[in-house]
Amino acid sequence: RALQWENLGVLAPFDMNKISNLGNVNPGMVAVGERDWNFGGKGSHWVPQLWGTESISWRTDKWTPDGLPSFGDIWEPNPGIDGAFMMGRTYSMMTGCGIWMHHQGKMDFWSSYKDDDTMRKNWQTITDYCISKKANLVKFWSGADPQKQGFTSDGVVVGQTWDGPIVSMMKAGEPVAYQTTDEGALAWVDGITLSAKAENIDEAYELINYSFTPEVGGMTINEIGYNSAVIGASDFYSDATKAISQAVYPGDTASKLNPWPPEPPWYADCLLYTSPSPRDWTIS
């Protein structure tokens, strides 16, 4: 959502000369900052720290997908599930639905990001379909803890979730699994920004350089369950982290991810008026 930040004026550009450990960071991810966060030609206003995915999770004691899971499994699960069973975040599970429809040949989902009219047409199709499946819904989530609670206490069987919260549950021995979808998981890169009003500038750069060491990168991932942008961080992954990474991204699936495309302001405005409200999802 870099394009949605540019006009706000709340971020300051980084002085890359002060990030002495920038060479430790995946150059392809650093390039995202130069490409998407270089506002007004003043330099990157963002540096990468973590990357992760959004895909399908499930209770292993209640359901198992037929092969790799699909974004369609929260809408038309295979094998089938009776009653309400799923959770997700509204716009991202609807994005997953669009990717699923794209792979079924029902729409060119990625063309939604080209112009207003195409976006509205595609998202109206997605919206109508998702509302028709509202009986599947147990809950919406809005952060990491609600995702965990969905599986532990709310009766969710399958969900479209982030990797981190569910991976941390897997490490704790909970009966859950997370895996990239057959269509390719949604991938994102989270980064660090500097407030335009920041006063503790030197301390901010110290923290960034500390974060960009392989050891700290690895320690961070062992605790939170995402993936590090720091080259060499995997050398400091625990055995449990390495094993789960192989289970989450089997074979060459990590090379088939779907990066979230940049969302211009008009896309966010259209999404606001096209996506269903909580009232639309209410089961009467």
Q: For each of these PLM feature ranges, what is it?
A:
Residues 127-133, 172-193:
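Periplasmic-binding protein-like
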Residues 185-186, 195-262:
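Mature extracytoplasmic/periplasmic domains
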Residues 140, 157-162:
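Paired acidic/hydrophobic, glycine-rich loop segments that form the ligand-binding mouth/hinge
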Residues 1-150:
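Extracytoplasmic ligand-binding site segments that recognize negatively charged/polar headgroups
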Residues 2-4, 160-175:
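A ligand-binding cleft/hinge motif common to bilobed small-molecule-binding domains
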Residues 273-276, 280-283:
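Single conserved hydrophobic/aromatic residue that forms the stacking wall/gate
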Residues 55-62, 101-104, 188-200, 219-223:
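A bilobed periplasmic-binding-protein/Venus flytrap-type ligand-binding module shared by bacterial periplasmic
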